Amino acid sequence: MTTFLEFIQQNEDRDGVRFSWNVWPSSRLEATRMVVPVAALLTPLKERPDLPPIQYEPVLCSRTTCRAVLNPLCQVDYRAKLWACNFCYQRNQFPPTYAGISEMNQPAELLPQFSSIEYVVQRGPQMPLIFLYVVDTCMEDEDLQALKESMQMSLSLLPPTALVGLITFGRMVHVHELGCEGISKSYVFRGNKDLTGKQIQEMLSLTKSPAAQQGRGPQVQQPPPSNRFLQPVQNIDMNLTDLLGELQRDPWPVPQGKRPLRSSGAALSIAVGLLECTFPNTGARIMMFIGGPATQGPGMVVGDELKTPIRSWHDIEKDNAKYVKKATKHYEALAHRAAASGHVIDIYACALDQTGLLEMKCCPNNTGGYMVMGDSFNTSLFKQTFQRVFTKDAQSNFKMAFGGTLEIKTSRELKISGAIGPCVSLNAKGPCVSENEIGTGGTCQWKICGINPFTTLAVYFEVVNQHNAPIPQGGRGAIQFVTQYQHSSGQRRIRVTTIARNWADAQTQIQNIAASFDQEAAAILMARLAVYRAETEEGPDVLRWLDRQLIRLCQKFGEYHKDDPVSFKFSETFSLYPQFMFHLRRSPFLQVFNNSPDESSYYRHHFMRQDLTQSLIMVQPILYAYSFNGPPEPVLLDSSSILPDRILLMDTFFQILIYLGETIAQWKKAGYQDMPEYENFRHLLQAPVDDGQEILQSRFPMPRYIDTEHGGSQARFLLSKVNPSQTHNNMYGWGQESGAPILTDDVSLQVFMDHLKKLAVSSAA
């Protein structure tokens, strides 16, 4: 008999789905009392090397309001060649190609191990990939040179049929013609003027191709008139390499005390307009590289006077950031247009100051694009991160997909409240859409323009079954996730995942429901909800909401005597949940203190799309200890773990930090590692470096690497993350285990838990 933990892990490995509850309360009333909603973390394109795509199309339910896909939960009559849909109970005839099926000869989609299955759509043209580079030239020469080298590297990784285009901008915006032999030719636009898609189309002499007008992507065989600006790599490889080589810093002079005039908003608008009228509904990627904030035209985020700093959180709270609303509105409109056409917008921002990611965040967030933030294009952090965008799988195809749509179907006791992640609503109403919206709701279909094997959405459901209509014993609820997308090979594919979970009466089987709680998934699902609210609500209000939910969960599932905090006990399935909430409250996703608006936008962007494992690391970083006392071991994220004779390795997802304890640091300064008789010390110093490198090699975006020691200025990154169990207030306690006291007024986990227990058991609550 597998345990719930094994069941949860097997389901995640097979289907890329983790539910907050794995047994569902059978009535609306009981479900609301569970505090944490029935919800799922879904990784639609989770890598399954053991799941080859099937070279035929899915069989659909014939009822027009259902159209669910044939799956292992359907009942099949092999003699009559009929199948009953498990969502609407419609009886359907199998198509003629299934004439040979029998109980001994079943198609893959009816086998339980294929609860997730991928189909290749045979009809329709195969589309080339499209990459449009949008490059800021207002930057230092070394930065521009490094960026040009990275772009040339990326060109060498593109398939020969991929179409590429180039737009450069500074004070003016240049759209480069790529079909000209031996001559550089570009269309120049003023950067301080906003243009509609129609105006851009007319100025560039682009007429919509007939295929584009029908809403279908143009076919590869008949390139549309846009081929002056978007050309196959194989035709213009040399031309484009030469053109990039000749790119110079923006020639307009920058007076003393001024910022360069940078037209980022106009450039992005032209890029969106160009793709919109030439390749609608086709996988395309706008890759925008910026070295500073937009200082003129639509989407400007700061004036050109250097003495006026770019907005801070303090300015925004005091309503003293005059460009924020207008700029955000401009970028939101562009994000909406790009998403409607199925195009992805990436933003690679490298500068020492803020560049306007707060205002631009909707572009990558709504289109499934990447957001990368660094200090300079001339760092390994940017170069390696950018190279990882073009990672390939075993078949040498990019691990990126385009033009995804996710459709969800549910059995009649469930409705869909909404989704949170890098998606936009397709406004598809249906019988399974709930009126109570969570995140992007009011629909059962979402568009995910850019999607990779780690892209993860949080989907929230509502149990709608009435209290007085019990579900028969052994009844199961089902959900089907249907993801259609353009594979990087050009094929259209459909990934179908169908799952079922048992219903239980919460009045008689509350233990079964409690035992099915997945505290890791629930913590991340509630965290996504909190971060989503933090985008529009006041910080303290979000923390209060989070605390209230935690107290209610403790009251519902804790064991205690009224008004006796000491008696409070949580079962194993809930025991880690309060600690996740403690670290979430202190995280940069909810605390903006000490972070710029751009940094907060960057952190939240990654949190809203990563899978469960990476999200947990972001909420509660992992700490490993290395010492002479034994092999490396995970230790508590606590100040008591900081000991003089230890090396610590901390992984926060965004940073990899190596910290040498006081004694270790002194030995290193004395040079013991260079003496042959202390070779074991040299190995000890090297071990965390090797482990850190392993993480650095595989993660996207590449983390910042921090090497520090006791008393070092960078040690603050570690001290701000650990639970301050020892502070300057209690460091002289009697008989305490030695650890590093932390100078903070933050509450420790112990105080937090004591307070939580007190509130949970209070009869006044």
UniProtKB/Swiss-Prot annotation:
Residues that, per the record, bind Zn(2+): 61, 66, 85, 88
Any one biological process term the GO annotation gives: intracellular protein transport
Highest taxon listed in the record's lineage: Eukaryota
Record-annotated disulphide pairs: none
Function according to Swiss-Prot or TrEMBL: Component of the coat protein complex II (COPII) which promotes the formation of transport vesicles from the endoplasmic reticulum (ER). The coat has two main functions, the physical deformation of the endoplasmic reticulum membrane into vesicles and the selection of cargo molecules for their transport to the Golgi complex.
Keyword RNA-binding on entry: no
Subcellular location field: Cytoplasmic vesicle, COPII-coated vesicle membrane; Endoplasmic reticulum membrane; Cytoplasm, Cytosol
Membrane topology according to the record: Peripheral membrane protein
Name of the molecule in the record: Protein transport protein Sec23A
Matches recorded under InterPro entries: ADF-H/Gelsolin-like_dom_sf, Gelsolin-like_dom, Gelsolin-like_dom_sf, Sec23, Sec23/24_helical_dom, Sec23/24_helical_dom_sf, Sec23/24_trunk_dom, Sec23_24_beta_S
Signal sequence, renumbered to the chain: none
Gene label: sec23a
Gelsolin-like repeats: 632-718
UniProt cross-references to SUPFAM superfamilies, sorted A to Z: beta-sandwich domain of Sec23/24, C-terminal, gelsolin-like domain of Sec23/24, Helical domain of Sec23/24, vWA-like, Zn-finger domain of Sec23/24
Organism of origin: Xenopus tropicalis
Keywords: Cytoplasm, Cytoplasmic vesicle, Endoplasmic reticulum, ER-Golgi transport, Membrane, Metal-binding, Protein transport, Transport, Zinc
Family: Belongs to the SEC23/SEC24 family. SEC23 subfamily.
Main subcellular localisation: membrane
Subunit structure: COPII is composed of at least five proteins: the Sec23/24 complex, the Sec13/31 complex and Sar1.
Alphabetized GO MF terms: zinc ion binding
Entries under Pfam families matching the protein: Gelsolin, Sec23_BS, Sec23_helical, Sec23_trunk, zf-Sec23_Sec24
